[in-house]
Every structure is written in structure tokens, then in C-alpha cells.
């Protein structure tokens, strides 16, 4: 109703006063255009005065209405150090003056060297130069719980401790190796059975007993070597080993038993005095002492040859004995002269048969084996050869 109020007095009593100024509402009414929105908009106003001040349009985004707030920067904090620099600096100034606080404090404790004096503002970069120009500007002081001198000494102690530990490890390792070597030496000596002194004493006893034996023990006619001072059983084994090595060199005479029996008979013909002495001394010695004793008797070359031949003969004897056990034995039967010859099959593969006769040890075919029995040539020799169930050993 304010816009439609009238002045009923019509300016009575105003005199020559200037005309009243127009109110802002009247100016707005004159300036505004005709509104055609029917007052249905969000900012419309219902009532008589439709052209009054409208409400501001609300927004769904709150940031558009709020002005950016500037957050003030936090105040700069002074740099913290584990060493009380300012307190010690004030103490040094109080005791020695302004010109001596930059040097190390002498005393019973640790010496601390100050790099810069912090100003009142607490900013370490803006250090003021106080003293004799020993303070560095624009540099930060080293932060550490211990001075550099203590750290250097700690590193040296650590290195020394590591070196001592490595030396102890090397000593323990060396002792372990020495203990292992000593144990190995002791076991080898125990395996030998006797010390070298005891072996030499035993050999001296045998040599003194051998002087009473007749020198006829050495028989070089058959090419065999007999060891002095040993009982007949040892001599028989040595001669059998030599004969077996000779049989291995000559396969035609491999299965002759006459040489071994003759050598055993000749070895048993040793005088009774030698048998008595050797039987007394030999059983008292251990078996391991026979090897060094035989090595000292006779020439070294003959003894080494004898040992190697005996070892080979023992090995070959086992192999040949096993082969003979696996091979079937044969013998002749039904011949005209009635003779019987025994042997065994050496090879019996396809189309090849070899028979070894026991009497001479020769390798023969079936026809030759029948002729060897004295029957002459036969049309079918396999009819006169019979395979036995057990081998002829």
C-alpha cells in the first residue's frame, strides 16, 4: 500500500520547499518492464505488489555461495637438536666471554664444538656471526646423539672385535683339522697291529731261526721260489700261487694237477728241525706281520713279483672255480676200447662246442674228444659223449 498512498494535503504548508525526491520504489517501478512470468517462478512474490524486490535464487552447490577462506600458514618452528646448543653457548659466554664460546669446552667431560649460534627467532638459516668469524652462515648443524669423535672410536672398536672373532674362528678350524688328522693317523697305526720296532724284532728272530735250516729249501730247478723260515703250509700256498700264475700264462696246462702236488711234496720234505723252529715262532706272530717279514727276506724284486703273482692267482682261482661249477661235466661212454675220459663243456653256443679234457687240459671238439679217448674216428661222436649232472672238480 505504500506504493499507492496519496498526499491528501496536496503540499499544504510546504511553502517554497523543493519538491520531494522520488523514492527508490517509484524509480524501480518506472524502470522495470512488464513481467510476463505470472509470478510462478522460484523468485516470484505473490501479492498486490508483484514488482517488488525478489528473493535470491538458491543453489544446490554450497561452494558457489561460500567465499574461499585463506588458511593462515603455521608459524615456523625452531629446529630441534639433541644437544643443548643455546644453553651451553650461554654458559661459555658467561665463563669465557663472547670470543671463546665457538671453541671446544675443555674439561673432564666430552668436548662439544658448536657450529652456529641460533638467533632468538629460532631460524637456523639466519645465524648471526658472533665471535671471531668461526660460525658458518647458511649451514645446518649436524644432528646426532653422540659427537663424531665417539662414533669414530666406536667404528674402530667394532672393526677390532670383528677381526678378533675371525681369528678365533680360524684357530678353531685349524684345531679341528689337526684333531681329524691325528685320529686318522691313530686308526691307521692300530690297523697295522704292531709298531715298526716290534716288526723288526720279529724279523730278527725269524732270521736267526732260518740260519739253522738247510739251504736245500731253495729249489730253482722248477723255477719256483720258496720263502725261508715259513712253515710248510705257507710254502705250499706260495708254491700253489706261483703254479696257478704259470697256469694262467699257459692255458693248455691250466688244469694239470701234477705240478701242484709235486711242489707240495717237495715243500713237505723240509727237515724236522726247521719245522719245529718255524712252528714255534710263526703262530706267535699275527697275520698282518707276515707281509713285512717276507718283504725283508730275499731280494726285493723276487718278493714283489711273488706277491703280485699270488694276488692274481687267488683272484683267477676263484673265477676259474666259479666257471667250472657253472659248466657241465662230460665223459665218454660206449667206445669200442671201453676207455672213459672226463672233461667239461667250455663253450656250447650255436654250432660250436668245445670240451676241455681234465687229463691234459686241452680244448677239443666232440670228434677230437672221442679220438682223444682212443676210439678213433666215429661217424656220430655226440652219441658217445654223456653229460653228467655234477661238474668234475
Curated annotation (Swiss-Prot):
It is found in: Nucleus. GO terms for biological process: signal transduction. Keywords: Nucleus. Residues 1-27, 155-200 are annotated as: Disordered. InterPro entries: Ninja_fam (IPR031307), Ninja_motif (IPR012463), NLS_NINJA_AFP-like (IPR032310), TDBD (IPR032308). It holds the Pfam family EAR. GO terms for cellular component: nucleus. It comes from the Eukaryota. Residues 156-170 have a biased composition (Basic and acidic residues). Belongs to the Ninja family. This is Ninja-family protein 1.
